[in-house]
């Protein structure tokens, strides 16, 4: 965690960072490197649907197929099927190793034990007990009966920003 904590602040000539900004550019870079191994499956959590939409669009622009669990039951089941089984609603094979979920409404009740990596895009700005509960619920989508792979959890924070202040407040009290 500490190693990943200041990723957004590192000086870099990476064109992704120039185009998308530090956090989103670095997230795309990390996801790309993880997907070199086709067995890796990634869950991205955010508190805001707009952020997840932006991430999804940016990943797609960079050739990374992804799904966003939102909408009606059919849309949600379609996104889950693509991620878990690599099959769309018409039975076609698809390559979709990234799924995005809102921490507000999509984390509970969803089983995603195929995941190998989880990203929290920003710290949760709530009281500590609530943050712990929300994170445990989110991680529990992948870390449950049926999980056979090692699961890595990463938090993306930008150094010297309100994000770092929130993270420090939650982890020092």
Question: What spans do the regions from the language model cover?
Answer:
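A conserved SF2-helicase RecA2
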Residues: 127-173
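Alpha-helical recognition domains of nuclear gene-regulatory proteins
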Residues: 30-33, 58, 82, 117, ...
